[in-house]
Regions:
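Active-site-proximal flexible loops/turns
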Residues: 88-90, 152, 180, 210
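Gly/Ala-rich beta-loop-alpha elbow adjacent to hydrolase catalytic centers
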Residues: 143-148, 152
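Serine hydrolase/lipase
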Residues: 76-77, 124-139, 157-389
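Short, solvent-exposed loop/turn segments at secondary-structure junctions
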Residues: 85-87, 149, 176-177
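Short, hydrophobic/amphipathic alpha-helical packing segments
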Residues: 123, 152-153
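A conserved cap/lid and substrate-binding interface adjacent to the catalytic center
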Residues: 38-143, 160-167, 189-194
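Structured loops at beta-to-helix junctions and adjacent beta-edge loops in soluble globular domains
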Residues: 15, 70, 83, 200-201
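Charged, compositionally biased non-catalytic regions
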Residues: 1-39
Length: 389
């Protein structure tokens, strides 16, 4: 299956930000990767506009991406390219990022409400584009940076499921898009080797939303790239820095492994038991806390015989649902409740809160308060990075 290089993918993900200006869109579509307009001036490519913002507040229609037919060397290939977050539309994109509820996509899988709304607002135009190009499509390339990466993930999943075309996904600094069910299902639909998730170590955006949202490919690290910039600076999220990190490299060369064994159970237990201080401004803390939260919730679910993913479907907030599960864990046997206690102590310490002395103090109300503070802190770091784009 044809595959574009990291350098080309990063160039397209960077230059697509011009999509908000109709004149610059025409210049973008003159890149050699796309089919040119015919002699009469008619272009086979389509400029996409999406609804971004809140459901009522700052709900605007804005240039968001393109559907493009491949040019020389890319014949019979389709490109779906989406821009990332920008503040040029009165920060409506930030509201899209902040709509962190769960909704179901067309396959009934749980995904991020804001990202799903943004994608489905463009879907009629995307469907028309595919109807106009029903020929022998060799491959569909879906790509984007930041918010654009999240939307590209939903687009790639839709293409693979609906049209069964070979599909490639390329994302840079993308946030999490769906829950465990979606991550597992979309990995099966696209296949792990066709999913290129690139992220910097200190980019805060791929760290959100917190669990139950998870990255795809399922059980895959993606293309991890070391970065030393402070988490709070937002510098590691800039597309220009991603372009610099991947230039002159192949996908196989972008295979660094995170320096800590975040997904090994014994290592997670060791981190939870450790007396070493934790700092919410550290990228390592967010990796550890994400793995530890999943580890503890799954321990509770196994003993209490509950489906974690089923719990997250419903009207209550995610903080309410996770607090419910953790509070249930406090009441279970010591071999389970101790992990809830250690987890909450770690989070409270990192957030500068008064640490609970014992598990009796860890009421459902307090647990919820801690989780809300944790979520607010994670979202603040991500939104700070987005505002600096």
């Amino acid at each position: 299956m044809n595959e574009i290089s990291p350098a080309i993918a990063s160039t397209l993900a960077d230059r697509i930000y011009a999509v908000q200006n109709p004149m610059l869109v025409d210049i973008f579509l003159k890149l050699p990767y796309f089919m040119a307009a015919n002699k009469s001036g008619a272009s086979p490519n389509k400029h996409l506009k999406a609804e971004v913002g809140g459901r009522v507040v700052l709900n605007v229609k804005d240039g968001f991406g393109v559907c493009a037919y491949g040019g020389k060397g890319y014949e019979d290939e389709i490109f779906l390219i989406f821009r990332g977050t920008t503040t040029a539309n009165r920060k409506a994109d930030i509201l899209t990022d902040a709509r962190i509820g769960i909704t179901s996509n067309s396959a009934g899988l749980p995904v991020h409400t804001g990202f799903h709304h943004c994608f489905t607002s463009m879907l009629p135009d995307i469907k028309r584009f595919f109807d106009e190009h029903k020929g022998n499509i060799k491959v569909v390339h879906c790509l984007g940076h930041s918010l654009g990466g999240a939307v590209a993930s939903l687009a790639a999943d839709w293409v693979a499921r609906t049209h069964k075309h070979p599909t490639k996904l390329y994302t840079f600094g993308s946030p999490r898009v769906g829950t465990d069910w979606f991550a597992n299902s979309t990995t099966s639909a696209l296949r792990k080797e066709n999913m290129h998730r690139v992220y910097h170590r200190t980019d805060p955006v791929p760290m959100v939303p917190l669990y139950p949202f998870m990255h795809a490919p399922y059980h895959g690290e993606g293309h991890y790239i070391y970065s030393a910039q402070p988490l709070s600076s937002g510098v590691a999220h800039k597309m220009a820095n991603y372009s610099e990190s991947v230039k002159k490299k192949t996908w196989e060369q972008l295979c660094d492994v995170p320096e800590q064994p975040y997904n090994i159970e014994r290592a997670i237990e060791g981190w939870l038991k450790s007396k070493s201080p934790v700092d919410s401004s550290s990228a390592a803390f967010w990796r550890w806390i994400d793995s530890a939260l999943i580890y503890v919730l799954k321990k509770i679910a196994m003993v209490a015989i509950m489906s974690l993913q089923a719990v997250f479907i419903g009207a209550f907030t995610l903080a309410d649902k996770i607090a419910y599960i953790l509070a249930k864990g406090i009441d279970l046997a010591e071999k389970v409740s101790i992990w809830v206690e250690l987890l909450m102590r770690k989070i409270m310490q990192a957030l500068g809160m008064k640490v609970a002395n014992n598990k009796k103090e860890l009421t459902k109300t307090l647990i919820r308060q801690v989780l809300v503070r944790l979520t607010e802190k994670a979202n603040h770091e991500a939104q700070n990075a987005l505002k600096k784009l």
